[in-house]
């Protein structure tokens, strides 16, 4: 039985206290822009003002292969997934480099890589070798779908129990933006041509094949659209199902989470249907160049923290946003108030001006 505990909202009193404190800090009101909103969100998630700086930010990269790659939808061969899992585990991937400077640690998990698991730990939640070709068959069986969602729940629980105070979901899987595009198209009622991007840098012919594959899978998805679990079974994959479980369970555990790009946010769209209200505990780390990513963000009513034209995945865009989130927390928790610093506030009369920009 697949289920999630009811999602409770972040602490509104802590958020209000954070916004009041922002107005009392030695700066004009609103001068820190989006940082003020982010700091209030962190305070609400932590239930305290000022918020604590993140001590154990954790990136979890969900890996899996997809049968749809046999249709030629990616610029890379399927065996690159297993090779990149080894690269991430060895510390040589982009996510490792970016996490190091952002103050986060990285874990990679194999849900459906089409190879033997690299290690017992990495493969502890492996559901199968490769997901089905969603253009012609279901990605998973019912039991595999349930197992993958449960794996995501268990991984989130394990990370929070180990002390993680911020989670980042990342992905690794050749061709995974194809099932992600199907999920986004299905859940936003969008035509394939408006959702499909160029992924890892495909040419026009590959884009056409990818769009056709999404069209065929989207046709198959119509019969299961009202059921998020059935949608993952039909047109998702073990990695996407696990990411959905992970994102939803982070909210159950009242732990803030940064979403990454197309694959993660597509899974999050499903997660919001599995556990309504979960999106209150998420921020969009970045906006990918994939057109479907913005559609998914709009559906979730999330604004990206950064927009650097990234399209890599792995959790890289969200990890680049982490220092911005840290800066937001630092400003709210470490700045002095006008009263503490003995600085004059803006005058109340009509001709008054606020302190100038420095």
UniProtKB/Swiss-Prot annotation:
Reaction(s) catalysed (UniProt annotation): 5,6-dimethylbenzimidazole + nicotinate beta-D-ribonucleotide = alpha-ribazole 5'-phosphate + nicotinate + H(+)
Entry's Gene Ontology BP terms: cobalamin biosynthetic process
First-level EC class: transferase
Superkingdom to which the source organism belongs: Bacteria
CDD domains listed in its UniProt record: DMB-PRT_CobT (cd02439)
Active site, per annotation: 314
EC numbers, comma separated: 2.4.2.21
Keywords annotated in UniProt: Cobalamin biosynthesis, Glycosyltransferase, Transferase
InterPro entries xrefs: Nict_dMeBzImd_PRibTrfase, Nict_dMeBzImd_PRibTrfase_bact, Nict_dMeBzImd_PRibTrfase_N, Nict_dMeBzImd_PRibTrfase_sf
Name of a matching Pfam family: DBI_PRT
Pathway connected to this protein: Nucleoside biosynthesis; alpha-ribazole biosynthesis; alpha-ribazole from 5,6-dimethylbenzimidazole: step 1/2
Signal peptide extent: none
GO molecular function: nicotinate-nucleotide-dimethylbenzimidazole phosphoribosyltransferase activity
Main function: Catalyzes the synthesis of alpha-ribazole-5'-phosphate from nicotinate mononucleotide (NAMN) and 5,6-dimethylbenzimidazole (DMB).
PANTHER family found in the cross-reference section: NICOTINATE-NUCLEOTIDE--DIMETHYLBENZIMIDAZOLE PHOSPHORIBOSYLTRANSFERASE
Family per record: Belongs to the CobT family.
Database matches in HAMAP family: CobT
NCBIfam families for this protein: cobT_DBIPRT (TIGR03160), PRK00105.1 (NF000996)
Protein name (Swiss-Prot/TrEMBL): Nicotinate-nucleotide--dimethylbenzimidazole phosphoribosyltransferase
Organism, as annotated: Mycobacterium ulcerans (strain Agy99)
